[in-house]
């Protein structure tokens, strides 16, 4: 049987309304025949909040001198002169006058205590122990040094976006040093001065005017000139020249800082002997350095910077002999016939620093060519032709960095052939293979002349046979060096960092050593340098940093042949350093 369709429901009969129908407010607003709809009423989320200003009242504004003082108007920060972390006029956080004239004050206390033991010759005229009959005496020494560095910088410009337009900087340094040794005629040429020395000095390490004379692009590429006593480093690791000389330097950038250049002339200043700081009370040396270099960022791959450099060193210090503050002759060095000499040398170099993927890489290559008017050993003029190469590769594994280091400096093959093939720098300060935590780099080991000529200089890696790294002249008749090293940097904790290095050292050629010591064949084995260091930052920041290190040189056969009378004690160097920064 067919199904019937469902019945349609019938509406209920309407009843007469008892009153007007209820209509929502929003429908009333929409049904208004004329005018704009009123804005919706926003309920108060927080009844205690401050009501917004009325649109019918005039706007109340308080003018302020500049945007840096907005925090003062809002009472967000109370400036304290001793607080370097919040807005502070002494730290260049806000203008001291005008709209963009700033002042920046930095104070650093650098304290060093350094016990060490190294081969030490006995005094020539006298000795601390009258019954001594050896060539070498007691080698224990210690030095305490305090440097108070005050940096004053007055500059104009908005440094957030571009370099300063003007900068005037002055950096005085107050130094105190105390040294004690076990043998006379080390701290002073006069043996009556004993075995201790207290000294102090006030130096000017920086005093220059910097002027940005041109902006060359919308990305603030610039040309700048700096005149006065200024810091300069020739390459990434300080292999060739790092100093605070007086001079003129033009520098700038192009192509959004991808190209950088330096063109400069510098004249080296005399140094205070016991502090190593500039002595502006003396006439500058007749030692000129002309530099031109060009940097390219993101060379070949992003993150690697390449530098090409040409340096001309013109040293014409032939007027007279020069004695240091302790009475020792440093120019010319007391070796050979010790007559005054001059030399002209050009360094052609290429340097790189950065990373290829996860591999951190730094490399340096130099070729030195020039002329020495008087070789002190052969007693005639000589041509300079020497090479230098260094590389360091490292990789990070989480909190651990593993490094490998290689350095080669050519050595002189024959001191009498009219050629100088031993590489020497102008004034080096290498940050390489452990740097100043290494015994070989940190300590100057005496060689001949009662210590008047050292095997290598203080904070130097090259065995240059110079009287003084700071006050002496370059010497290209030297044995050269081969260094192979490995190292580890470990970030143990946010406060703690540990560093360890092992470097194996060889001379490249010992002919110059044999000539100076009047000694037969000397082995190339120099020794093994082992060092460990730790850094502690109690507040996780760089304002308080404590560094400590210990290093030993395990003598090789060649070192033992040079210092056979120096006893069987292993040379060592210990360093404790506290740096406080404001």
PLM feature segments, named:
Residues 1-164, 171, 398, 402, ...:
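N-terminal periplasmic/intermembrane-space "pro-region" immediately following the signal or transit peptide
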Residues 76-105, 116-120, 155-168, 213-223, ...:
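Short loop/turn motifs that connect adjacent beta-strands in outer-membrane beta-barrel proteins
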Residues 105-111, 168-172, 225-227, 261-263, ...:
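Membrane-embedded beta-strand positions of outer-membrane beta-barrel proteins
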Residues 126-146, 155-222, 233-235, 335, ...:
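Surface-exposed loop and membrane-interface regions of Gram-negative outer-membrane beta-barrel proteins
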Residues 219-221, 232-420, 482-484, 492, ...:
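Signature for the C-terminal beta-barrel architecture of outer-membrane proteins
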